[in-house]
Amino acid sequence: MRSIAGAILGLWLIASGGAEAPDAGQAVVSPSISVVAAGDIADCGSDGLQFPDAFRTAGLIAPTDTLVLTLGDNTYPIGAATEFADCFQPTWGGFKERIRPSPGNHDYMTTDAGAYFDYFGAAAGPDRRGYYSFDAGGWHFISLNSNADAGVGSAQYAWLQADLAANSDTLCTLAYWHHPVFSSGPHGNDRRMADVFQLLHAAGAEIVLVGHDHVYERFAPQDAAGNTDPERGVRSFTVGTGGARLYSLRKPQPNSEVRGASTHGVLRLTLSSTDYRWAFVPVDGAAPRDDGSAPCHR
C-alpha cells in the first residue's frame, strides 16, 4: 500500500474562541465524497454545557461533507434524552440528517442506550442492536457496536461475516465503532473488538475509525495481532476529539505513526471508488495536523 503521511506530531496548541454550529444543508454531490468523523462529543456536565468544544468541532463540518460518522459517546455524562436535546442537538444536531452514528459506553449509561436509539431513530440501524451497514460513494460502510458481544460465535460477529461476504465485490471498506483495539491513550488497547478487526483484515478492509480515548492517533496498516502489513493491513484512526475533555497520551503503542492530544478536531476523509485521503482538521483553524493518502486494496 502506498501512503503519504505526516511525521510524528509535536505539541498541539489549543486555540481560544469558538464557532457556531452550521446550518443544516444538503450535501454537494461530487465524483468523490467527503466524510467527517469524530467521537466523544457533547458534554453536558453537571451544570449544563461545560465544554463548548462541541460547538467548535461542529463548526468544522461543511455542507460539502456528505456523511458525518459519530464514533460513540455522543453525549456525556450518561447519554440521557436531556443531553441529546440540550447538548448534542444545538451542536452536531445541526446536520443530523447526514449523521450515521455508532454508540459508546456513555450512551449505554442510560438503560439499553434508549435515548441514543430514540434520538437517531432509523439512522442507528435496525432492531436497536447498534450495528448496520450502508454504501456511499463506492465505499461499503460498517457501523459496529463495541458495547455488545462481538467475539467469535456472537450474533454481531456472524452478522459481520455475512455482511462482508455479501459485499466482497466492493473494493473499498470502512468500519467504525467506539472502543479501540489499539491506542496510546489512557484506556490503552482493548481486545473486545479484536476478532472483528481480524475479520475486517481478512476481508481486505481499508479503514477502522474509533473513539473512547480522547486523543487523535493514526496507526500504520496492521492486522489484529498488531503485525504491520503494508499491503493488506487495516489503517486505524482514533478520533476521540469531538468535544469532550481531552486526555493525555501514554507510551506510544507499536505502529503508532501520528498522535496528538491537545486540540479538538475532526477527521475528514475524501473517498473515491479506488482510493482515499485523510486530514485531521483542528478547531484552531491551522493547517491539518495529519494528512495523507492511500489506494484501496486491490
Predicted features, each with a name:
Residues A279-R289:
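Short, solvent-exposed aromatic-acidic interface loops
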Residues P22-F84, A150-A155, A162, S183-S184:
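N-terminal active-site segment of His-dependent metallophosphoesterases
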Residues S16-E20:
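N-terminal Sec signal peptide cleavage junction
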